[in-house]
Curated annotation (Swiss-Prot):
PANTHER family: FLOTILLIN-1-RELATED (PTHR13806:SF46), FLOTILLIN-RELATED (PTHR13806)
Record keywords, A-Z: Cell membrane, Endosome, Membrane, Phosphoprotein
Name used for this protein in its record: Flotillin-1
Protein's membrane topology: Peripheral membrane protein
Family recorded in the similarity comment: Belongs to the band 7/mec-2 family. Flotillin subfamily.
Complex and partners: Heterooligomeric complex of flotillin-1 and flotillin-2 and caveolin-1 and caveolin-2. Interacts with ECPAS.
Subcellular localization, as worded in the UniProt entry: Cell membrane; Endosome; Membrane, Caveola; Melanosome
InterPro entries per the UniProt record, alphabetical: Band_7, Band_7/SPFH_dom_sf, Flotillin_fam
Length: 427
């Protein structure tokens, strides 16, 4: 089951599966009943009234001191909370406060023993800081933090503090009398200084008045010079303005003449334009009409030539297409002829080979005898036996031709004589 606690309280869960124990400050925790245990510890701030009665100071004077301290168990620091749980778990707030009070009182007594009454009485802040510092370093090991410490009261049974007050009162009265005498002395000195400063101020005032008079006269002379200069400049400016006005009048007159002359020129230009228009109407218009007519004729001739050229181009294109079609038809016919020859060769294998050889033999013979037809002169050499002359040439040619079937057989592997004597076979 779940257990919750506020921010001023911490829970410690121990038992099964809780080693080390779980500490939760201001939250909730799940606890297994019967096998786990939950304990709570207060995190409230405790106010302690720390009294130290008749403690002997450094000079052996017994005094009593009362201080107010605010302490609490620190729940945000896990280590301090663990230390506080080890020392105070299961104890009440009163018991925790009593332990902290005893610790603080011991440190307060120790600090009082190391200081004089005057130091404690006059410098309470120093005493409070020392107690706070020493006590905090000790209580932090218990998990307790000192929030604040203030010295509330100091008293004694020997009238030591009262005697200190009397001595202080006498010192104050003495200081007051000395201060009064010094004040009277300072007043006389200040009065004399005031008189001296008054005379000095009077002299300085007269000097300043003389300087002011001098500056006035100098400035007045400068102003007079400036006024006369400005007056002369004004007179000169007037004369210059009169001259400028006359010059402007003359310029206006010249401008009027220029305008009149410009108007005359404009009238002349209008007359010239009118005459040019008359000339254009009488001469230029007919010439332009003739030129326009010639341009139209040239354009018509140009269009006719372009149309003729386009017609010729179209004729050439159609002739080319017809020739291309004829070439294609001829190529198709040749291809068809070749295909039929291939079919015939496949059908009549040896006969077809013989036919091809016989068809090409005249061409071979023509190529062999070709060089003889182009020869201009034949020179024969003989060893003295056999025929001579033309019969010799004819015999050589016939001998070449008779050996032609053997050459064909060596090149193609087909014997013309054997093919000729064999009966035809189909595939």
């Amino acid at each position: 089951m779940f257990f919750t606690c506020g921010s001023n309280e911490a829970m410690v869960v121990s038992g099964f599966c809780r080693s080390p124990p779980v500490m939760v400050a201001g939250g909730r925790v799940f606890v297994l009943p019967c096998i786990q245990q939950i304990q709570r510890i207060s995190l409230n701030t405790l106010t302690l009234n720390v009294k130290s009665e008749k403690v002997y100071t450094r000079h052996g004077v017994p005094i009593s001191v009362t201080g107010i301290a605010q302490v609490k168990i620190q729940g945000q620091n896990k280590e301090m909370l663990a230390a506080a749980c080890q020392m105070f778990l299961g104890k009440t707030e009163a018991e925790i406060a009593h332990i902290a009070l005893e610790t603080l009182e011991g440190h307060q007594r120790a600090i009082m023993a190391h200081m004089t009454v005057e130091e404690i009485y006059k410098d309470r802040q120093k005493f409070s800081e020392q107690v706070f510092k020493v006590a905090s370093s000790d209580l932090v090991n218990m998990g307790i933090s000192v929030v604040s410490y203030t010295l509330k009261d100091i008293h004694d049974d020997q009238d030591y503090l009262h005697s200190l007050g009397k001595a202080r009162t006498a010192q104050v009265q003495k200081d007051a009398r000395i201060g009064e005498a010094e004040a009277k002395r300072d007043a006389g000195i200040r009065e004399a200084k005031a008189k001296q400063e008054k005379v000095s101020a009077q002299y300085l005032s007269e000097i300043e008045m003389a300087k002011a008079q001098r500056d006035y006269e100098l400035k007045k002379a400068a102003y007079d010079i400036e006024v006369n200069t400005r007056r002369a400049q004004a007179d000169l400016a007037y004369q210059l303005q009169v001259a400028k006005t006359k010059q402007q009048i003359e310029e206006q007159r010249v401008q009027v003449q220029v305008v009149e002359r410009a108007q005359q020129v404009a009238v002349q230009e209008q007359e010239i334009a009118r005459r040019e228009k008359e000339l254009e109407a009488r001469v230029r218009k007919p010439a332009e009409a003739e030129r326009y007519k010639l341009e139209r004729l040239a354009e018509a001739e140009k269009s006719q030539l372009i149309m003729q050229a386009e017609a010729e181009a179209e004729s050439v294109r159609m002739r080319g297409e017809a020739e291309a079609f004829a070439i294609g038809a001829r190529a198709r016919a040749e291809a068809e002829q070749m295909a039929k020859k291939a079919e015939a060769f496949q059908l009549y294998q040896e006969a077809a080979q013989l036919d091809m050889l016989l068809e090409k033999l005249p061409q071979v013979a023509e190529e062999i005898s070709g060089p003889l037809t182009s020869a201009n002169k034949i020179t024969l050499a003989s060893s003295g036996s056999g025929t001579m002359g033309a019969a010799k040439v004819t015999g050589e040619v016939l001998d070449i031709l008779t050996r032609l079937p053997e050459s064909v057989e060596r090149l193609t592997g087909v014997s013309i004589s054997q093919v000729n004597h064999k009966p035809l076979r189909t595939a």
